[in-house]
């Protein structure tokens, strides 16, 4: 996202930019879903968007309109392709396939040490998440948004393509916060995810049994699994920005840009990228960049309650 934003701004057209990735990405290895007002930068790449959402629990059954927002799905394959085309079209952007082995700040520059050599810059942006510090502390509560999702195709029409099932808590909670999440692409195709906000991961079998059980309860028995995906996203208000330096800025999940109360990352990152682009034009040291606001504190409080009363998650979201 940051590379794309920099490439769109003429201010950076004469700046040398190097993108280092462990391997080139060209598949649907992830799906981003997010709320957004009006048309966004990736509107043409969207898989689908919706205007209505459903929330279900033992005591609540609610359809609600999202206006002035829309809920949008962006799949990674199209996004990666757009980024590759952007890199290839601009001479000031170079791509390197290499594995990062270390990051070091020395003087007024940071060094990226890779399997293909060492690179130094006064502005280094790191999106590789290192969980060590997060899980070695006790001050800030830590949960995970973890899930397995199936893209399925049913034999008959089963889904309302005009609305998403945002959260369905009408499944066995097992003393945790568990729900189903369904994004219908049309009346026969949908992404169905079994999701938890909890401290510990499950065996793969348990997520998939949860999906099978849910579909059976919805009387959906004839379907094909076309794709699978899984994820594990940290949820915490831990201050990752303490690891930034004058020449190094951690971004995305590595920078604490995931919304702590939900595990959503894409729109938070998109907003922060816009702020970074403006910030770079000031010439200030990167560790002066700050994203904290009152919502950071609200998320901290919410997550503290959710971690202590994880079995009551559905009541909190009601």
Predicted regions and their residues:
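N-terminal FAD cofactor-binding segment of flavoenzymes
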Residues: 5-59
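C-terminal helical "tail/cap" subdomain of flavin- and related membrane-associated enzymes
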Residues: 274-318
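FAD/FMN-dependent oxidoreductases across multiple families
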Residues: 100, 174, 198-275
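Short, flexible loop/turn motifs enriched in small residues
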Residues: 47-50, 175-177, 243-244
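A conserved beta-strand/loop capping segment in the N-terminal third of enzymes
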Residues: 36-98, 103-108
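Predominantly flavin-linked oxidoreductase catalytic cores and closely associated redox partners
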Residues: 5, 9, 89-223, 239
């Amino acid at each position: 996202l940051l590379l794309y934003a920099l490439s769109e701004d003429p201010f950076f057209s004469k700046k040398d930019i190097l993108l280092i990735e462990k391997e080139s990405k060209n598949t649907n290895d992830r799906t981003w879903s997010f709320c957004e007002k009006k048309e966004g930068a990736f509107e043409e790449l969207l898989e689908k968007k919706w205007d209505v959402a459903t929330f279900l629990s033992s005591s609540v059954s609610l359809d609600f309109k999202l206006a002035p927002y829309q809920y949008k799905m962006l799949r990674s394959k199209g996004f990666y392709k757009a980024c590759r085309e952007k890199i290839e079209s601009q001479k000031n952007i170079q791509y390197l396939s290499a594995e990062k082995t270390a990051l070091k700040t020395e003087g007024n520059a940071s060094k990226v040490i890779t399997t293909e050599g060492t690179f130094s810059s006064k502005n280094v942006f790191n999106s590789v998440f290192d969980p060590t510090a997060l899980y070695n502390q006790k001050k800030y509560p830590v949960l995970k948004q973890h899930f397995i999702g199936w893209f399925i195709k049913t034999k008959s029409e089963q889904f309302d393509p005009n609305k998403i099932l945002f959260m369905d808590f009408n499944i066995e909670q097992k003393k945790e916060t568990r729900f189903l999440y369904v994004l219908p692409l049309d009346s026969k195709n949908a992404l169905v995810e079994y999701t938890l906000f909890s401290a510990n991961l499950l065996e793969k079998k348990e997520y998939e049994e949860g999906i099978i059980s849910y579909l059976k309860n919805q009387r959906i028995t004839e379907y094909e699994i076309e794709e699978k995906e899984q994820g594990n996203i940290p949820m915490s208000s831990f201050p990752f920005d303490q690891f930034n330096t004058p020449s190094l800025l951690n971004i995305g999940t590595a920078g604490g840009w995931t919304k702590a109360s939900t595990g959503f990352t894409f729109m938070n990152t998109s907003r922060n990228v816009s702020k970074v682009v403006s910030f770079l034009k000031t010439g200030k040291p990167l560790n002066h960049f700050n994203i904290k606001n009152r919502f950071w504190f609200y998320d901290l409080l919410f997550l503290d309650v959710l971690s202590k009363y994880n079995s009551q998650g559905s009541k909190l979201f009601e």
